């Protein structure tokens, strides 16, 4: 009997812990909230425990550290600290694939994304579908670019496109998951760009040409290594497939360089696995 009592106590205790640990994905999304923590410029946690991915802006990453990441986080902290924020959701659902709320953040009549764009602490980043009038966001970004504020003073943001992420190592065996290799490329210019004739080159000089695809300002395209049907409707996540039967990118170290149709370098990004210090 003494062995049963702890078990009867333990089961509801474990259930309580499991419920507490589960992501709050089924509750209705809050319209207003207090922010309990800021991870980086575009990611924060609400007092409810919900994590929020900010709409309309992509800020430099804290890990691995990117230039102006700390300044972006500090700007977001100062904007939301001690204040009730309003959350603006889009037409495509309230949560992303990571379970985070996807929302704009307002304090009174001030939009956090515009606040960051104006200071050059991020670039326009549209998560489709999104029917927002982007004019004020583009204007804020262009004022920061013209003044060379923040990221616009760095070499990484001098082209029309910016590689925001580089997944050179697919999950599992790359040979069986070729499309698990991909880059995400954002149009950081104020105008739509036709990518026909652009190409991407790996560290060994192998070249892959982009198909015709119009990339609106602030939108991203996922560039997969393998075969598939191109997704060219900007109301959804844009995607192109380079058509390779085998993995393109080296898991240990590689470099992706994008050239425009005239052979000018638009952007480049390196992937490398850092060795642990003994």
PLM regions: where:
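Positively charged n-region of N-terminal signal peptides that target proteins for export
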Residues: 1-9
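Small beta-barrel nucleic-acid-binding modules, primarily SNase/OB-fold domains
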Residues: 2, 20-278
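Bacterial N-terminal signal peptides
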Residues: 9-18
């Amino acid at each position: 009997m003494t062995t049963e009592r702890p078990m009867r106590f333990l089961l509801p205790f474990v259930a309580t812990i499991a419920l507490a640990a589960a992501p709050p994905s089924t509750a209705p999304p809050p319209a207003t909230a207090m922010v309990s923590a800021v991870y980086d410029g575009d990611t924060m946690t609400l007092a409810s425990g919900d994590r929020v991915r900010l709409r309309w802006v992509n800020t430099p990453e804290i890990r691995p550290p990117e230039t102006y990441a700390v300044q972006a986080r500090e700007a977001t902290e100062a904007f939301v600290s001690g204040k009730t924020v309003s959350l603006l959701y889009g037409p495509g659902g309230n949560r992303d694939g990571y379970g985070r709320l996807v929302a704009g953040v307002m304090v009174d009549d001030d939009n956090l994304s515009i606040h960051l764009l104006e200071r050059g602490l991020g670039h326009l980043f549209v998560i489709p579908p999104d029917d927002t009038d982007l004019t004020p966001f583009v204007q804020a970004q262009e004022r920061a670019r013209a003044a060379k504020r923040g990221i616009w003073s760095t070499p990484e943001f001098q082209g029309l496109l910016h590689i925001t992420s580089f997944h050179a190592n697919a999950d599992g065996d790359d040979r069986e998951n070729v499309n698990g290799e991909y880059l995400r490329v954002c149009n950081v210019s104020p105008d739509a760009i036709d990518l026909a004739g652009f190409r991407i080159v790996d560290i060994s000089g192998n070249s892959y040409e982009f198909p015709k695809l119009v990339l609106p300002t602030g939108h991203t395209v996922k560039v997969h290594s393998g075969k598939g049907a191109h997704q060219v409707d900007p109301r959804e996540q844009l995607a192109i497939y380079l058509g390779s039967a085998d993995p393109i990118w080296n898991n240990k170290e590689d470099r992706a360089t994008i050239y425009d149709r005239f052979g000018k370098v638009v952007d480049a990004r390196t992937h490398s696995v850092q060795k642990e210090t003994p």
